[in-house]
Amino acid sequence: MKTLIFHSLETSSAKKLALDLGGEVELRKNHYRIHTKKDFDIENYRLSSDVDLNIFDNNFDYQNIRLMVSDMDSTLITVETIDEVAKEVGLKDEISLITEEAMQGHLDFTESFKKRLSILKGINNSVFESVYKNKVELSPGTEELIYYFKSNQIKTAVVSGGLKFFAEKLQSQLGIENCRANDVQIINESLTGNIIGNVIDAKEKAKYIGE
């Protein structure tokens, strides 16, 4: 028996997928599980689905978990924080152009982050607090997820290519033990457009986890 995690509560799509797999649908709090005996290529289903799909190992032993690491933007929270900051100060279009360049492969993450940061140069850092208070919302299930790991003595960490201010606020709010994100330079309460240390890209995330 295989279990497919359907990361959505979109009932009709879950049932359609279950029918295709000859499986049974199980409703959980924030997702569906599809139990099937049929062999299938998950990559094919991922390509044709707007919903995240993952295989759940029925033999997985939770006792072996020692660390849970999560991204922040559009993961633990529902928004992209740097985009929300840009909207707040009227720079949404400029930031969107850089995002589009990155999506087209013209910029890697480090280059795109530095360009976005340079656009935000000069803004008052009080905008961060405003965005966190008024725009940042936890994704459904975030609190339950962190509570589960902490109650089972499993360490938690948020590692993000976003801004350290938001990652640390989230860390404090949820009681997450470890945190790593981009630390930006602020002088006289204004962003200088410079980053302190390395940009937290995929390699830096992997390095931090290895520590």
PLM-predicted stretches and their roles:
Residues 1-70:
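Non-catalytic pre-domain segments flanking phosphatase-related domains
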Residues 74, 105, 160:
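Residue-level signature of catalytic and energy-coupling elements of molecular machines
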Residues 73, 91, 122, 184-185:
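Short connector loops/turns at beta-strand edges and beta->alpha or beta->beta junctions
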Residues 75, 99, 156:
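Ser/Thr-centric signal marking residues that sit
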Residues 65-81:
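Asp-based phosphoryl-transfer active-site loop
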Residues 75-76, 107, 191:
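Hydrophobic "anchor" residues
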Residues 127-211:
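C-terminal cap/substrate-recognition subdomain and adjoining C-terminal extension
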Residues 81-151:
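A metal-dependent, Asp-based hydrolase signature
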